[in-house]
Regions:
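A short beta-strand-loop structural module common to alpha/beta enzyme folds
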Residues: 81-86
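Short, flexible/disordered intra-domain loops and linkers
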Residues: 89-95
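Active-site-proximal alpha/beta segments of enzymes that process anionic O-linked groups
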Residues: 98
Length: 263
């Protein structure tokens, strides 16, 4: 009898380990505050600096993991959308966005897209200098393999008017075009919005063009960047003062930033 119970216990433990070791998608979530909101300030205009960066979990092209290098690249930005952000590591208790926010004195929000061993594993994040009154994380489907995706929408209060910041990291269109449709549909809901992220597709790809709101402006288009780039800053209801980038090195992606002005 003891042998039977031992066998059942081993099977149960094996089942738990199997389930925990699988990568699971996270459902949608919403909230009204970011971590460390005391770091935010009132927007006094007239312009703000916005960046997007796939940080590759802070692993550089030299193979070293160095989050401080990422912090140096993005310092000076008012709002930064990050992709491929790592969740809490064993013993640390904090995700990479939390550390970046602490070093740069910015409010931080980690939007995990998947969990591993029952804990948030990887996802996207936002660092913001201005108050955020609302955020919503939306799971995107279909997802393939371990690449679960999401879209997070933030309402940022600037000069008494809401500006919506959308951050995402999409799989290649060949793995499913529905996420592109969902992201562009959400982007089109807001008259003043900034869509940032890694789209794994250039601007002229049919999946980008098909659902893009007609009044969308590619904020990086006139800066002479590679037309095949997949990292985007798309805007509606704002104008571009200037755009710039930092090369790969701290990550396997370049960092892109723009200075925007409210219309």
């Amino acid at each position: 009898m003891l042998g039977i119970w031992t066998g059942l216990a081993v099977l149960a433990l094996g089942g738990v380990i199997f389930l925990a070791s699988r990568v699971w998608s996270l459902r949608g979530q919403r909230g009204t505050v970011l971590a460390a909101p005391d770091r935010t300030k009132t927007f006094n205009g007239p312009a703000l600096t916005v960046g997007t960066y796939n940080i590759h979990r802070a692993r550089g092209t030299d193979g070293r993991r160095d989050l401080r290098r990422i912090a140096r690249v993005i310092s000076g930005c008012d709002i930064v959308a990050l992709q491929e952000v790592e969740g809490p590591r064993p013993g640390s208790g904090h995700n990479q966005a939390w550390h970046l926010g602490r070093w740069l004195r910015l409010a931080a929000h980690f939007a995990p897209s998947r969990k591993l061993f029952f804990f948030p594993h990887r996802g996207n994040a936002l660092l913001c200098r201005f108050p955020v009154s609302y955020w919503q994380r939306l799971a995107l489907f279909p997802s393939t393999g371990r690449a679960h995706r999401n879209l997070t929408v933030y309402q940022v209060d600037l000069a008494g008017s809401p500006v919506h910041i959308l951050n995402t990291h999409l799989s290649k269109p060949a793995e499913g075009a529905s996420p592109f449709e969902a992201v562009m549909s959400a982007f089109g809901q807001y008259p003043r919005a900034i869509l940032l992220g890694d789209f794994n597709a250039p601007m002229d790809h049919p999946a980008m063009r098909r659902w893009l709101p007609p009044d969308t402006v590619d904020a990086l288009a006139d800066a002479g960047f590679d037309p095949m780039r997949v990292d985007m800053i798309l805007i509606r209801g704002l104008s571009v003062d200037e755009a710039w980038s930092s090369p790969i090195g701290p990550s396997d992606h370049p960092f892109f930033a723009v200075r925007l002005r409210l219309q």
